[in-house]
Amino acid sequence: MFDFDSYIRLLREDPKTIVLPEGTDPRVIEAASRLLAGNFLQPILIGEEDAVWEAAQEAGYNIRGAKILTPSTYEKMDEMVEQFCEIRAKKGMTQEKAREILKDPNYFGTMLIKMGEYDSLLGGVMHSVIDTIKPALEIIGTKEGNNLVSSCIGLVRPRAT
């Protein structure tokens, strides 16, 4: 059985970052708030900053301390576009098309991981599995010699009383 407490202890010793592309969804905001309170993963929310703060306020969660990134104002967008064009060069990617694609939070978030800016990404609350996995396959790909991809869904249900 997985020892969740040991995992949390390891994360607290060496905190990591997690990109959350669906930054305005109340469930994602709740998760970010819990991560901040638990002090073991630093959430990076993607979305228009005002919209993320408004959603957090409406949902009643404190996300102070979370980083919020907006694709349209990201300071390293030119570098990101260049790298994305290099990765997708065989598919005829242009800078104009890359800028449009990178407005999508799943593509933007995946490029943040590819560029080494952050450690991990978790998505799929508002988007389908394919919309979440496709950017990872196109940008990061699979391990050499491995062509199998899998996803995982975790469900938490209340304990019976």
What do the PLM-derived regions correspond to, one by one?
Residues 1-161:
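Anion-binding alpha/beta catalytic cores of soluble intermediary-metabolism enzymes, centered on
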